[in-house]
């Protein structure tokens, strides 16, 4: 967590992830034996945090921790591009015209990725890992640099979901493509955690992993879970909007944390798979609110790739709750989709 702020008799935890701050009242308990519990720890190169209201008959924090960390370990084992023994990295190491048996979770995300790729006309794609490495952002990246046209053309031959095929329980490829689940894996993990908490009888919680989150129910005092959406800037923390969240996942994607500058141009880690280059437009960040944390995760990346105009049209067409922060000469311009206003509850500026 980034720090603790005191306001009157409330203690507010502020956790800074990518573009969101969680405002959570910390209370020791009520006379009925209920209490607010909090667990967290490292995961997938980052952290996770779970806050939930524990009623007297519900699972203790140690049991919740075991369940949550079991899910996170499974997702990491199947989908991490930063460990050579993960299922997806073993697949990535295979040559063209190979197949590998995969767990159902991996095949599910491949199908979701194909859907998002088709809906974005190929701009979003799960097979961008070779591009990430070429530009210096990926797990195999050696140096942040602008590649030559020849090097880019060679790598683009190994990019595109059309090179993937699901055959029963196997994932196959007809080119030496490499899959990167970083735009969907954490959201998937959060959905799995939320489902497990529900199954354990926990219905008031906020679950977060590597910045993707989902909230349901109320806090201990009956107030809603509140999320602050920050301006995409590094010099200070400014909340653009505060939203109430109940039953939705929230994800923010931006170009302001992982980038490099060359000749006055900003090159971020978000790629348009069609060109093979980082996006170059004025859309600084996108926050998506969606019933599925997985879809919020993937859609926030998709919309960031599309840019301010295409992303707006896409969000309106598909009824997506999206909060856009666009760079302008005088600072930032905010634009929200109709669905965002409908989904996000009471808000304050």
Regions found by a protein language model. Give the residues of each.
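Sec-dependent signal peptide recognition
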Residues: 15-22
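Mature catalytic core of soluble alpha/beta enzymes
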Residues: 2-8, 13-15, 27-349
